[in-house]
Amino acid sequence: MQWGTPSQKDKKVNPVIKKFQYGNDTVTLETGRIARQASGAVLASMGQTSVLVAVTGSKEAKPGQDFFPLSVHYQEKAYAAGKIPGGFFKREARPSEKETLTSRLIDRPIRPLFPNGFLNEVQVVCTVISAEKDVDPDIVAMIGTSAALAISGIPFNGPIGAARVGYTQESGYLLNPTYSTLKTSELDMVVAGTADAVLMVESEAKELPEDIMLGAVLYAHQEMQAVVQAVAELAKDAAKPVWDWKPEEVNAELKAKVEHGFADSVGVAYRITDKQKRYDRLSELRNQAVAELATEESGVSADEVKGLFAKIEKQIVRSRVVAGEPRIDGRDSKTVRPLHVEVGVLPKVHGSALFTRGETQALVVSTLGSARDAQIIDALEGERKDPFMLHYNFPPYSVGECGRMGATGRREIGHGRLARRGIGAVLPKEEDFPYTMRVVSEITESNGSSSMASVCGASLALMDAGVPLKAPVAGIAMGLVKEDNGFAVLTDILGDEDHLGDMDFKVAGTADGVTALQMDIKIEGITEEIMEIALGQAMDARLHILAEMNRVIASPRKELSENAPQFHTMKIDPDKIRDIIGKGGATIRSITEETGASIDIDDNGTIKIYADDGDGMQAAIARIEEITAEAEIGAVYQGKVVRIVDFGAFVNFLPGKDGLVHISQIAHERVQNVSDYLKEGQDIEVKCMDIDQRGRIKLSIKELLPAPEAETAEAPAGEGEE
């Protein structure tokens, strides 16, 4: 992108610029000109899309800090696309769903690369300041984040690269496809990793086989090496000295005391298969350790004891798994927890399902609405409507805790989007099923992989509502424990296995292929073999879950729920649209108020009618047919006199249509004064006699009246009088 030339007088501005070719795009990384007070700042550009990434770190950790406070904020500025924000205040408000998801996308691959024990606060702010409509800025933001961290001096085991991958059978894999290219792609995958390892995968696909998905991951990792190399070269020229930071030394004496006093008891506790009982016992042991070891005389803090206690937990669980011993809940590495599936569990909703897998449970509800219920998304690339929504809720009671209730959190938004990715490939096309669909997953119990339970529940609830899905979908979460002496891939991981393991690998799909894949890896050295094994085990588990789901409901119900809105579509002449809408929308408003129906009209004359019941639907159809009806010669209509003139009367016989009853067509006898026969507002029956080239309609009352008796009797004699 062409930027302004700095003033020659400003000697302090000495930007360092690195350009490199990335597939078909030229990427520019610039530092030293903007945001110079941040620990590290890079302006990353790809084509005309630019993201300013500023990284700031605290030199000291807060006292008592026991977690790594990393925060990532991705924000899209309206001015980047030449737009002014809507709303009363006309400025950017709370983060959109896209901004939240991209923030998580950036956070996930960089978080494991900070050294263990590093607890200093780090903040990453990515601001989209210039945007092309056809380019997603997320990859640019990830590249910029990698570069900003690399030059910041903050301890970081990077750099990372990032790539988006598309796929078509004709073209194979596509590097960093545009929005328009993705419309025809069977895959949308984002991969991030270092020079040696893949760290993060986020994808949705149209039922692709496992080998294509794995190939896409490997292709992305190979291509992103251009980014890793370029960032490393930028760091050579512009990086600040790395902070002189060292992790706190482990208290060897305290560690030995914790291990000697509690390792055996912790090992026994991890044989308790019931989650709550296990947690209660571990809590007792943890409190006992703190009480015995964190005393004033010892000078040891409770946090130190708890930290070492957690390390013992991790060590015990991991060593058992790698050794092939039974897992925490007694299963082997490939067994899925017991399943229980119900549909139609709520009487008044459109579709519902209760999906239970072990101690993870989701109550999922589907709701159908009209086209106007679709979500309006005001994005940088333009406004669009989304007819499908999947919302995920994770109340604190699902894990037996008290907690904050309120605004939707980042985690809930991320899990909802993952579940949506899993379902998206099997949804019907809008022209085949013109309803707006909303799915809500209420996590009522949680012990691992609630997002994949949401996928299963969403598939069941949509089929229960009668939504014509192409195929049922199921999801499963895989885990990994890797030690020097071996590794184990775990099917259907528990929450503890997710926390204590090295990988969270979630796969959703149908019997024919993968629809979504998400992978987060906490260590380096995940090989192609490990990923292949994980995908294979995931497929076996997915097919097992699908078989259990199919026993309850194998295909969508033939009829929509009686609680769902009725739908009817009809086609009219586009010139008639104004008649249905009426002046200032008065006509269509009256139809909706009288019938209770919701009406959407396309510019091509297609009318979509939604109603809560059949009566409202039929009433709305009848009104529209009346308004759009054309006069037919010879047809008889019930009309109302709207105006009387010297030469006849104008009669309204169809909505918006008036015709003339000429004075000669009012009665068989000669009419001298129209007012003697007709009054304004009078209801009469008329017959359509003719429509001239200008569309004027001639009506008759006389044609519907019986002929006079005298005229009828004298007619034969009168034939020969002349």
Swiss-Prot record:
Residues 565-624 form the KH domain. Mg(2+) binds at residues 498, 504. One of its GO terms (cellular component) is cytosol. The gene is pnp. Its cofactor is Mg(2+). It catalyses: RNA(n+1) + phosphate = RNA(n) + a ribonucleoside 5'-diphosphate. It holds the Pfam family PNPase. PANTHER family: POLYRIBONUCLEOTIDE NUCLEOTIDYLTRANSFERASE, POLYRIBONUCLEOTIDE NUCLEOTIDYLTRANSFERASE 1, MITOCHONDRIAL. GO terms for molecular function: 3'-5'-RNA exonuclease activity; magnesium ion binding; polyribonucleotide nucleotidyltransferase activity; RNA binding. Component of the RNA degradosome, which is a multiprotein complex involved in RNA processing and mRNA degradation. Involved in mRNA degradation. Catalyzes the phosphorolysis of single-stranded polyribonucleotides processively in the 3'- to 5'-direction. One of its GO terms (biological process) is mRNA catabolic process. This is Polyribonucleotide nucleotidyltransferase. Its EC number is 2.7.7.8. Disulfide bonds: none annotated. It is found in: Cytoplasm. Keywords: Cytoplasm, Magnesium, Metal-binding, Nucleotidyltransferase, RNA-binding, Transferase. Its main location: cytoplasm. Gene3D superfamilies: GHMP Kinase, N-terminal domain (3.30.230.70), K Homology domain, type 1 (3.30.1370.10), Nucleic acid-binding proteins (2.40.50.140).
